[in-house]
Amino acid sequence: VTTAAFAPPFIEPGELPAALREQGYAVLSPQGVSEWLGAPLAQLEALHADWNDLPPDAYLKDGGRYRTRRHACFTVDGESIAQVPHRAHWQPVEYNALHGGMQRWFAPMHEATVAQPVWQRLLQRLGEAASGMRGTKAQPWFVEAHQFRIDTAGGIGRPTPEGAHRDGVDLVAVALVGRSGVKGGETRVFEASGRRGERFTMTEPWTLLLLDDARVIHESTPIQPLEEGTAGWRDTLVVTCRAQGFQGD
């Protein structure tokens, strides 16, 4: 059965601060992301080779083998960006009932990737977006970055095995880096304390979703292979900004 995919509700980059304040989320098209960063899309697309070299996630409690990932942490304060010593990823059980409450150590992002000017620029702009969303002047943001590949080698892959959730941070950014040979993977965003929701499917590489984590919950539906017996994948980058230190400190 083929289901219609809803297109993302793209906004212009200049509308981003108001959209985050008014509805708690915003979606930029790849062209919008390029404009927002002041960088050619090709510089972002050049990062994609990294996703072919992500080690398996050894912590999946559903017994799955469908997720590979890398992780890195930074502090972002205005134009100052610093990578911090590699550390575990930790979330409280309140925010991640499946994998919360445990120290999860993932392989670090490649040094060559985090040294790229476009990577530094992305973190800087996300810090600015977080400050604008919270109505603060430039302040330190504690940033975690996650490279994910979800594959369908086992028949089904779950981008968010924990279900609809919040991350316990201020700003969440989810970029679709690429997808191939899969159906599904619909993004769903709901008001945390209301009834409004939005659903759409990100299909173009470097489509970017930004979320006010205090106001909305989010999930992505499972992916399946387009053709039985042919494995596919969905690659994403998730970056979170938190004001009061890293979770677990």
Model-inferred region functions:
Residues 75-142:
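Signature of the catalytic double-stranded beta-helix
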Residues 186-249:
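Catalytic core of Fe(II)/2-oxoglutarate
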Residues 135-204:
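Catalytic core of non-heme Fe(II) oxygenases with the double-stranded beta-helix
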Residues 1-96:
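N-terminal auxiliary "cap/dimerization" subdomain that precedes the catalytic jelly-roll/cupin core
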Residues 3-11, 137-158, 207-222:
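Generic detector of solvent-exposed, compositionally biased contiguous segments
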Residues 35, 111, 161-164:
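Conserved aromatic-histidine-acidic binding/catalytic patches
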Residues 68, 139, 167, 214, ...:
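A short, structural micro-pattern
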Residues 31, 76-79, 146-148, 176, ...:
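Structured loops at beta-to-helix junctions and adjacent beta-edge loops in soluble globular domains
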